[in-house]
Amino acid sequence: MKFIRETKDGAVILLYVQPKAKKNEIEGVDEWRGRLKVKIKAPPVEGKANKEVVRFFSKMLGTEVEIIRGGTSREKDLLVKGFSSKEVLKKLGL
């Protein structure tokens, strides 16, 4: 899958984030962007949406995650520490 890759530190998920949504959810894969589309309730103000993305994926995956690129963009790269891409896909149900 184009939206996930492996590094020495873990798996990196390529995200496209839509802030100010009705609920936090994974909407699916944006084939054109090659990213996983995620809806987040928090607004893109003062890092609130970024914190919500980290909290959402940490809870879903049960491990520490970190935004490594795209802090001020809708396109973000999220590092899932210590997990392979296969493990991440399984936990996300993809």
Curated annotation (Swiss-Prot):
SUPFAM superfamilies: YggU-like (SSF69786)
Pfam (any one): DUF167
Disulphides: none
Gene3D superfamilies (UniProt xref): YggU-like
Assigned GO CC terms: cytoplasm
Protein family: Belongs to the UPF0235 family.
NCBIfam families (UniProt xref): DUF167 family protein
PANTHER family attached to this UniProt entry: UPF0235 PROTEIN C15ORF40 (PTHR13420:SF7)
Protein name as catalogued: UPF0235 protein TON_0641
Organism: Thermococcus onnurineus (strain NA1)
